[in-house]
């Protein structure tokens, strides 16, 4: 990634279904200039998927927002705020408690994103599963699973 392509983007999880792009932006506006705010919605239903992204113009603004907003309440729900993972491939194996076959927080598969592959601490015995398993947060959904505890697969020898 070239220096000009650097994005200072936060992942915001645990959003209320009612949270809009505007209310997400308003909640983070005091931390610096916001270039973009987006609540991710289901393509078919148009309903919020419970997470979104906020992109800042500077790294300091992003870091302040992460430090001050993580665990805070927005629209009646406690939110999780982290630095967003790159859109590129996952981190390859391991990660946050990742067991067999990749897994972990953004590890394993090229469709990457949060929990791509085995999911958030998932063991990956037959696919899917875990916190965002399969497509995962920010993943391209090149296969089953996806979402909170996304399904798919079973025990496999």
UniProtKB/Swiss-Prot annotation:
InterPro entries hit by this protein: Nucleotide-bd_a/b_plait_sf (IPR012677), RBD_domain_sf (IPR035979), RRM2_NsCP33-like (IPR048289), RRM_dom (IPR000504), SLIRP/GR-RBP-like (IPR052462)
* UniProt key word RNA-binding: yes
Which controlled-vocabulary keywords does the entry list?
RNA-binding, Stress response
* Induction (record text): By the plant hormone abscisic acid in response to water stress.
Gene3D superfamilies in UniProt? 3.30.70.330
Give the molecular function GO annotations: mRNA binding
* Cited Pfam families: RRM_1
* Region (Disordered) location: 82-157
Where is each RRM domain found?
A: 8-86
| Bias type Gly residues, positions | 87-157
Protein purpose: Possibly has a role in RNA transcription or processing during stress.
Q: What is this protein called?
A: Glycine-rich RNA-binding, abscisic acid-inducible protein
Organism equals Zea mays
């Amino acid at each position: 990634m070239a220096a000009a392509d650097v994005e200072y983007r936060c992942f915001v999880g645990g959003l209320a279904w009612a949270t809009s792009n505007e209310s997400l932006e308003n909640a983070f506006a005091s931390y610096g200039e916001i270039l973009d705010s987006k609540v991710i919605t289901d393509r078919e239903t148009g309903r919020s998927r419970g997470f979104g992204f906020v992109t800042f113009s500077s790294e300091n603004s992003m870091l302040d927002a992460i430090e001050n907003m993580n665990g805070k309440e927005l629209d009646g729900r406690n939110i999780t705020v982290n630095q967003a993972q790159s859109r590129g491939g996952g981190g390859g194996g391991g990660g946050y408690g990742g067991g067999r076959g990749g897994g972990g927080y953004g590890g394993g598969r090229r469709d990457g994103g949060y929990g791509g592959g085995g999911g958030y601490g998932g063991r990956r015995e037959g696919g899917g599963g875990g916190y965002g398993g399969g497509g995962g947060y920010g993943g391209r959904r090149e296969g089953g699973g996806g979402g909170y505890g996304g399904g798919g697969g079973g025990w496999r020898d």
